């Protein structure tokens, strides 16, 4: 079981966040609306989520290249994005290599209905707890800031599901902290996550579910 911590998101642009201001504004009512993952979360007010979820090549193009080179993906590699949203990353995978076979699932009906035209036929409504594909279906399975939106037992199940459908590589990013200050910021910043913990606890959780892929963290900073 290789299981390694690696930042494959180092090419993803980091937005400037005023954590303290946001923490003071977010209320439980905002979290309740955000966790429905409907229009308000993607394209509503910033307090409910993205505040406008639109495609821009600067977000995923370099990260897609990073994935492709790191995992040495072949010309006909199959890639699954769990929590694909409107399919932006899948679009950039196909821009990088038109022979890649891509697929995406998202719990949000709104996101799937508003997916980019270029990938609409490759995405579907789906749950990370019950990934609608056969065992060993994909060369690379990616889940970025998604499985932590599940309760703990469901989160464990989603990790097992990722392991099941991946025949070679997988990469997961989850909300986490390394110290008390980061924990305080995360608890205030978080809108949708239901499972979040110290990085060491995540590592133990991955091992307990026999996860053999790679992982990294979203740290509120």
Which stretches of residues belong to each language-model region?
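Short, conserved loop/helix-junction motifs that constitute active-site signature segments
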Residues: 164-165
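Class I (Rossmann-like) S-adenosyl-L-methionine-dependent methyltransferase catalytic domain
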Residues: 1-71, 76-82, 86-132, 150-157, ...
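Conserved acidic residues
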Residues: 139, 168
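Short catalytic micro-motifs in class I SAM-dependent methyltransferases
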Residues: 145-149
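A conserved beta-strand element that flanks and buttresses the S-adenosyl-L-methionine
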Residues: 142
């Amino acid at each position: 079981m290789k299981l390694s911590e690696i930042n494959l998101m180092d090419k993803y642009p980091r937005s400037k966040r005023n954590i303290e201001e946001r923490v003071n504004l977010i209320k439980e009512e905002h979290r309740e609306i955000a966790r429905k993952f409907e229009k308000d979360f993607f394209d509503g007010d910033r307090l409910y989520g993205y505040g406008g979820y639109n495609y821009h090549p600067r977000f995923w193009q370099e990260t897609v290249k990073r994935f492709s080179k790191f995992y040495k993906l072949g010309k006909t590699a199959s890639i699954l994005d769990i929590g694909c949203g409107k399919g932006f990353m899948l679009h950039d995978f196909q821009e990088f290599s038109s022979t890649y076979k891509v697929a995406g699932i998202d719990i949000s009906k709104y996101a799937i209905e508003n997916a980019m035209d270029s990938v609409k036929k490759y995405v579907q409504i789906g749950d990370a707890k019950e990934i609608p594909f056969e065992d060993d279906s994909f060369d690379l399975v990616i889940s970025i800031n998604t499985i932590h939106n599940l309760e703990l037992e469901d989160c464990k199940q989603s990790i097992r599901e990722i392991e099941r459908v991946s025949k070679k590589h997988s990469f997961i990013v989850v909300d986490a902290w390394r110290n008390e200050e980061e924990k305080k910021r995360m608890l205030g910043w978080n809108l949708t996550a239901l499972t979040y913990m110290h990085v060491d606890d995540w590592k133990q959780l991955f091992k307990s579910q026999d996860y053999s892929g790679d992982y990294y963290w979203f740290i509120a900073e």
